[in-house]
Amino acid sequence: MKRSEINRILKSSEDFFTSQNWRLPVWGYWTWDEWLARSALELDEILTQEMGWDITDFALGDFERKGMVLFTVRNGSTPATGYDKPYCEKLMIVNDGQLCLTHFHWDKVEDIINRGGGTLNLRLNNANADESLDMANPVVVYIDGIRRVLDPGAVLSLAPGESVTLPQRNYHSF
């Protein structure tokens, strides 16, 4: 992606967060010079845990169709990293017509919360022991604490304000 495209997406993302009354941590607004003025020790958790902006087209060169914007506020980790947080918090922007590629997390339980902007559609499958898509067994998730059993590969739609808890090894794309 070209730097000019990344800068345009960053500005648009900041505007969207503002329109939804979301504020980033103070370091989410720092200039390059403000980052450089900080010590590595002061920034260790942010850098080690890969927190902050992530604008990706998944190396496919088609951001408008296969891409997304993330701002990682907290990132789950194991005690070995020195930052024992078995959870993460990420603000994500997926535009109409965009797709976040299918993936799962080995160790993290994930809450996906639609904070606003439109309906979020997720396709859900379990992972088999060999990490292939399980097309045979139902998917159990909790939507705002309410247990739902879905067919494998079902599309779950979340309206603004709704959330879903995805267990470990749950394939999802949105």
Please name every model-derived segment.
Residues W22, L122-N126, D151:
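Short, solvent-exposed cationic patches
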Residues N95, P152-F174:
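Conserved metal-binding segment of the jelly-roll/cupin
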Residues M1-C88:
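A short, N-terminal "cap"/entry segment at the start of jelly-roll beta-barrel domains
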